[in-house]
Amino acid sequence: MSCMKDPLSLERLGAGNNKLCSSSPSSSSSSSSCHHQQPALAMATALAPGQARSSLEAAKHRLEVHTISDTSSPEAAEKEKSQQGKSEDAGPEDPSKKKRQRRQRTHFTSQQLQELEATFQRNRYPDMSTREEIAVWTNLTEARVRVWFKNRRAKWRKRERNQQAELCKNGFGPQFNGLMQPYDDMYPGYSYNNWAAKGLTSASLSTKSFPFFNSMNVNPLSSQSMFSPPNSISSMSMSSSMVPSAVTGVPGSGLNSLNNLNNLSNPSLNSAVPTPACPYAPPTPPYVYRDTCNSSLASLRLKAKQHSSFGYASVQNPASNLSACQYPVDRPV
């Protein structure tokens, strides 16, 4: 009984009870073992009420802690195992993640490259069947052939872009150099203060080349003569107006013959221009394209001959100037 009253023995008793309850495999066995120990605990509380209560509270607290740890131990164990497995898996995987998988480079032979280049020159976008045929010829896989054509097209596009950039830097290229003239040759420089003083002279205009006038073989300064009536017509009208004043002693028959000669010498003019009623005010004739130099010289020579012939006739026949009433009449006596 003395050992039961001793507090140390009571604590040992509670600890033993705790161990028994915690080590039980099932709830039924733990409840039965605790149930068997309850009379001893009741006796200990009856013998030493103050110390037994404190020891009982401590034992109950330990029992609760042990039961909670027992119930949560499988889940905690699983969590700990999963965390340990993750850490073990992450250990060897970290270096593999850091290191990228290296690509396998294909080393083509010269024969394979020749075959691929020849096919690329014919067709830059081969279809699946063509790629398979090339793969059979070159002893390569279809994927390798497809990748080679993709890289080759990218290189070709880059080269085309570089060539276009060089053409833009050098101007419009060699094919446009003959069409575009330098700026200085097209527009000679003038100072801003000398525009009014210099002006455009006939010499500067004659030095310039006009392709339109060159094709017509006409000087640009003489272009006015193209759109004005020929000098031969005006000279002929002037000469015809001067005929009565020059030949005053010629009778009416002589004037008629002169008009007839003019009509015979210029049939084209008579068909185009009607004979005027008054020779002093002839109407302006329509435009007729003629060679101005040749026609004017020929008409002047013809008229000079006509004037000379009529002048001699008037000198040789002075009696022709007399009228009918001026002749002497012999009256019979």
Curated annotation (Swiss-Prot):
It comes from the Eukaryota. Residues 58-67, 76-89 have a biased composition (Basic and acidic residues). A motif (Nuclear localization signal) lies at residues 301-305. It is found in: Nucleus; Cytoplasm. A motif (OAR) lies at residues 295-308. One of its GO terms (molecular function) is DNA-binding transcription factor activity, RNA polymerase II-specific. The keyword Cytoplasm applies. Residues 22-33 have a biased composition (Low complexity). GO terms for biological process: anatomical structure morphogenesis; determination of left/right symmetry; embryonic limb morphogenesis; embryonic organ morphogenesis; heart looping; heart morphogenesis; positive regulation of dermatome development; positive regulation of myoblast differentiation. Gene3D superfamilies: Homeodomain-like (1.10.10.60). May play a role in myoblast differentiation. May be involved in the establishment of left-right asymmetry in the developing embryo. May play a role in vasculogenesis during avian embryogenesis. This is Pituitary homeobox 2. It comes from Gallus gallus (Chicken). The lineage of its organism: Eukaryota, Metazoa, Chordata, Craniata, Vertebrata. The gene is PITX2.
